[in-house]
Swiss-Prot record:
Belongs to the HRG family. It is found in: Endosome membrane; Lysosome membrane. GO terms for cellular component: endosome membrane; lysosomal membrane; plasma membrane. Its main location: membrane. This is Heme transporter hrg-1. Pfam families: HRG. PANTHER family: HEME TRANSPORTER HRG1 (PTHR31525:SF1). The keyword Transmembrane helix applies. It is a multi-pass membrane protein. InterPro entries: HRG. One of its GO terms (molecular function) is heme binding. It comes from Caenorhabditis elegans.
Amino acid sequence: MHQIYSSDVSSITSKSSIAKAEIITMEEEQQRQSCCTWFHSLKVQIWIAWLGVSAGVMAGTVFAIQYQNWIAVTMCFISSGFATLVLHLHLAYKKTQMAGWSETRLRCLAAVGATVSFLSFIAMVFCLVVAGIEHQTLDKQGLMGANLWIAAVWFFMTSKWSALTWRFARKYRAFCEESQPLLAAAPPEYSVTI
């Protein structure tokens, strides 16, 4: 039984129960037609993570070779690293390899993601304020060297991917807690001596 996300009434059936209430269910074979449901599917999330990895690597290469903006280059590659972590979490969940992971590993990933997200957001705000005060430009000449407008964009991207690392590490940790048995090992045998 699925929750209904679309307003398409033709795909639902109603069944009456004993208390004269109606239960609305969707058939298992029918596809949901909501954009929100499509966007949050695991396949789409994997593609978005791949896009984040490739965008970080390509942008880092361009900013290193053409503009020599080393702050942006560093943040591009850090952002790509967090996108890789998100991709790894999704693929491990999809391949059901996450069942053997310890809760501590996912807690550490979540803590690192939350910390880096917070620090990157503060750095983004700092870059925006300083770039505005110094009247940095976005023309060809202004982009050469340490341009804080571009650095702010990549601090934001790092903040986003590290926040997604935090979010999915917490989500998959809850999944691991549900899937693990209450007793990982057999209980110790009790011996009674008379």
